[in-house]
């Protein structure tokens, strides 16, 4: 518990001190934002700051800081260090500066920013890469909620159809019609679940692995046959959304088009990432208790769940912990956490993909027919990937690993683009150069040495 409290305080101090330093480096001013200068009632819509924050938080979070932190907790207390240092010095910097660059460039999407700072060839690679990643995000976040809902009633295929139908509607409608109205509610639910678990941590005061117990790979010691991942680079791929995630750079332009002032960028972009880091920290702590100090070892409970047809272990951990610690309320919160949150992440992923394709092909998005023309191929590709995922018993975990690698590779493009911007502006580029070098090393190493990387 001492490590958990120290790490939580570190995230708060990181926002207050380092976040303010990064803000001074960028130097926001009072120029008109895209929400004002380019208002169109569809994607460029000025919204209240609190609503922009809640939507940004849910867009970048979803179940990423839950599932990723749970799987990363298998490595042991070393996961704490990646969450706090990654979040403060890499992830929040990445999110803030990518969001602010989008603001400064008329709400431009990530491929457009990469083209401006890294050149046309890099932008073309990123365009394909980003759309593929976003389709993969939508696919990953169809399967897990459909499986959970299928265990409650109805068939898994039926729930997949329902979720896809929602995706089509949410992707095409103006951003303030569905996303602007219901996302803040789901954000509150996700935060409330994390706060409730923090309260229960202090009530139960469980014995937890601490940093001074050692930074070795606890997963390999506890389950040597079932857990074979190495700390480097696998930990830094597994915990993405709680530390740094390239996916966030595809989402920040959505809110950059809804922000009324540049000066609110730090609490919106940097603050949302720090908040996500806190959620990841909570779930990493709870998961470490589950795997290593619970009355019945977590690996045994997961094996029992798999025997009953529950193949995705991370959602199962959420259900087991929430129901055990929070009772009936926990079951409701778990539903919101592992059903609603991934669905909302999926629909904003497809929305981002639609906007990226539209901007690349210069297709006007005001006519509904134009939006539909882009959406149909995206959903067909996602459905094909989903069929493969269903046919493969380990499909979810395989896609999650590829999603994690693609996610972090996207962050590499973003960090190098921001570094070039800072060099051109004669600003302290070291704040993104070091994270860019580190994440480049992580992604190339994973591709070169991980068995999962060549699993297909």
Model-inferred region functions:
Residues 10-11, 90-106, 110-174, 240-244, ...:
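Helix-loop-helix module between adjacent transmembrane segments
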Residues 7-17, 130, 134-138, 170, ...:
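Selective recognition of specific alpha-helical transmembrane segments in multi-pass small-molecule
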Residues 201-214, 270-320, 390-394:
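Extracellular/periplasmic helix-exit of transmembrane alpha-helices
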Residues 121-127, 131, 157-161, 271-280, ...:
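Loop-to-transmembrane helix boundary motifs in multi-pass membrane proteins
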Residues 10-66, 264:
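Membrane-interface "cap" regions at the ends of multi-pass membrane proteins
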Residues 47-64, 200-206, 217-283, 333-345:
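Hydrophobic, membrane-embedded alpha-helices of multi-pass small-molecule transporters
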Residues 2-19, 72-102, 111, 331:
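Extracellular loop-to-transmembrane helix junctions
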Residues 138-142, 146-161, 170-171, 191-221, ...:
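Hydrophobic alpha-helical segments and their helix-loop junctions in multi-pass secondary transporters
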